[in-house]
Amino acid sequence: MSVSGLPFDDFRTLLRDLPGPDARALVTARERDAQLTKPPGALGRLEEIAFWLAAWTGRTPAVNRPLVAIFAGNHGVTRQGITPFPPAVTQQMVENFAAGGAAINQICVAYDLGLKVFDLALDYPTGDITEEAALSERDCAATMAFGMEAIAGGTDLLCIGEMGIGNTTIAAAINYALYGGSARDWVGPGTGSEGEMLERKIAAVEKAVELHGDHLDDPLEIMRRLGGREIAAMAGAILAARMERIPVLIDGYVATAAAAILKAANPSALDHCLIGHVSAEPGHLRAIEMLGKTPLLALGMRLGEGTGAALAAGIVKAAAACHSGMATFAQAGVTNKD
């Protein structure tokens, strides 16, 4: 990143100058779809997914190197008693990912997806957002830059996920800051907060947004003050994918909050993204609607780990396979409609 100016300056420049889709590839995909052995529109959203792939990759729809990227971070706000699990669980789950024992590992095997896990200074939780900013601008920008490395090994479909005890509190605070309403609108149980603990979680979100209220007109400031390292890294990964025209599948409530930061900075910033699923976390559907998106799946999941995005990758792979592998009417000797 630049050694001059403020730490966020380079990201602001990138967000102003985002590349768009390949219009010619989109036209070509639509023309081929019209000749495939099916009635127009019969494959529903699979057709739109194929067009989306073509437009962003600039070629015939294909998924050859899908990747799930999980970003793990810890949060100082857990000191407020807002979650039943201790922060140590974040590191333990990272180790579980490495050992192949988590749900995401099984889904990646089932759908032939690559998996990378990014450990984001787990021994150094972010600042407690009810008392101070989560990150300095320099640390936040550096973490965004680190997240951009998610695509370094090459991928043509990036699935964005996370792991972090306390991060549904962070996501709720971001959504509350971006969209308003009340803290209660955005706070859900997460990993199992209920009763008095849930009330503490709501109070923490209210206190954090009030504390930082004078600085919340800038999306990047919202991210550094109310977010976390996995939020910043996911935002960086989504932005890096856009610069390389790599399609992205966004996972659950927390990943959607990271994406919302980019959308607030540039309304077109998520055009290369689809939402993999709507989770059972109460605020997620509303957050998705605020982004103008429609999730691919609704399975009642609320695990995180990129699991919903990974499952949606199977649908995207199927959409590409149908578009590329189906015969045309002429090839199959099937009579087309008049």
UniProtKB/Swiss-Prot annotation:
Keyword Isomerase attached: no
Catalytic activity: 5,6-dimethylbenzimidazole + nicotinate beta-D-ribonucleotide = alpha-ribazole 5'-phosphate + nicotinate + H(+)
Pathway assigned to this chain's UniProt record: Nucleoside biosynthesis; alpha-ribazole biosynthesis; alpha-ribazole from 5,6-dimethylbenzimidazole: step 1/2
MF-aspect GO terms: nicotinate-nucleotide-dimethylbenzimidazole phosphoribosyltransferase activity
Keywords, in A-Z order: Cobalamin biosynthesis, Glycosyltransferase, Transferase
Record flagged with keyword Glycosyltransferase: yes
Domain of life: Bacteria
Protein family membership: Belongs to the CobT family.
Entry function: Catalyzes the synthesis of alpha-ribazole-5'-phosphate from nicotinate mononucleotide (NAMN) and 5,6-dimethylbenzimidazole (DMB).
Protein name as annotated: Nicotinate-nucleotide--dimethylbenzimidazole phosphoribosyltransferase
Taxonomic source organism: Rhizobium leguminosarum bv. trifolii (strain WSM2304)
Name of encoding gene: cobT
